């Protein structure tokens, strides 16, 4: 407990800039390695199997957000409860966090496995996929859904480690699982490729590495003497409700990304055909990977914002918000510049046909141009989650795939004969508008905290004067 107290004091006293580096750097490095899970699967599929396999992994990828969404809801919600409880020294809530997490994982993962395996093909058909791409995607996705419990428990419990401030250990464990997958995937693909099961081999490698990772996380919370431990597997209604309230926005962000990407693939099929689905598959993989460092920084921001807010240090919350938002924008710049300068090289990671790559270069630049503003958007969602303001976080989560993108993708391709090029443009406009909304909500929230602090100080001064 002494080490937990020391970490709490560092979060409450260290300068925001230094805090950003110390909390975020391990998370960024670890999550980049973690992101190589699906990124490498797509590269291996395209380079070792073929274009149809690359397309199959791409259309299946959005549906993996079902598990990512559940893990995010359970993990981010629980981590928010934990960090605020640590800040407020609420030991009862701290002791209940892991029991709730285990129960939620067991129930929700079982449901996803049953439904996902049964309805994998109809789900994939929603993207407009046909023929070999649909058949391969179905086999791949069913195997991924069979590993739901492993990936959900591993990811959500890892978020608890981060909520405790154990960022280096959390990222090291997740990175180990990702490296295992990168080693196993080509071995399984090459071993099964001649039997026509190369893509199934990639899926099996992913599930096996996630199972190992889940076992390590279980050992950590059962055997290690940490702030949050698995002592009693039971659900507390109060903690469960708070986890759901805060975590639903994290789940919405993931699940509605599924909706957005499914709509993109459907629009690509209608306006362009299978080749444009493959191009969008490569572009979305690159964008998703570029988002990962931003979410890594958000993992450092979450305990900083939540712990300071729980301790009533509202000015530090504001200063940390500014520091992390600037840092996230700088981080986004590191990905934005190469994407703008070398789009051919980026697309060629997944696509071996030079003519197809050349076909998508200009549209890829348009698609990626608004990514530069996404760091602020991610910090905004994390801020609202950390403060327990699930409604604002949910608003941002809903805005991107539904409130903004759906009307734009219906309108823009029909303007001036843009067609398929309008689908790419609709994605960029959506992200630009979302960043503006996030900034406005963050400014309003920080001003509200400042005014609330001023009112509290005035009341306390008045009571002191009367006494």
Language model features with spans:
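Short alpha-helical transmembrane segments in multi-pass integral membrane proteins
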Residues: 1-24, 82-149, 180-183, 187-248, ...
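N-terminal transmembrane alpha-helices
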Residues: 11-49, 62-77, 81, 106-113, ...
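Transmembrane helical elements of multi-pass membrane transporters/channels
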Residues: 22-41, 143, 177, 209-213, ...
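Helix-terminus/linker motif at the lipid-water interface of multi-pass membrane proteins
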Residues: 36-54, 124-131, 187-197, 255-285, ...
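Alpha-helical transmembrane segments of multipass membrane proteins
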Residues: 39-42, 114, 122, 156-160, ...
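Interfacial/gating helices of multi-pass transporter permease domains
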Residues: 45-65, 131-136, 199-204, 239-246, ...
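Small-residue-rich hydrophobic transmembrane alpha-helices
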Residues: 54-114, 151-170, 279-337, 341-343, ...
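Short runs within selected transmembrane alpha-helices of multi-pass transporters and secretion channels
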Residues: 75, 144-162, 170-178, 202-217, ...
